[in-house]
Amino acid sequence: MNSQANYLLPVPLSSEKLCARGFNQSWELARRIDCDKHIHKNPHILRRHHHVQHQAQENRANRQIAIQGMFYINPQYQDCLESASVIVFDDVMTSGATLNEIARVLKDNGVSRVINWVLLRTLYPSS
């Protein structure tokens, strides 16, 4: 499983949603992926600022706007990302807005390569 990556990171939930649900489904799946020992799995590097309303009915443009500025890097891990290759794992991808925003944040913080792994892809109407 992609031996060139340094980290495997799940898409984070907001603290509100994590407390309500009790677990991050992306992390529960990602931590069970059998990958090379040197790929560090870590649910604490990526953080989400706050919860927004459920976006299931939003069009692609509105999703991209709503997700801007939503994610950040935990300052405790900032230095370890310099020139790293990172796999971002999401359970379900709809428009790709979340993964695009996370990739932007990671690259803005020194990551050299972002690879997206997605378990399921929804059918999304073009709009």
What feature does the model see in each segment?
Residues 1-88, 95-126:
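Conserved PRPP/pyrophosphate-binding segment of the phosphoribosyltransferase/PRPP-pathway fold
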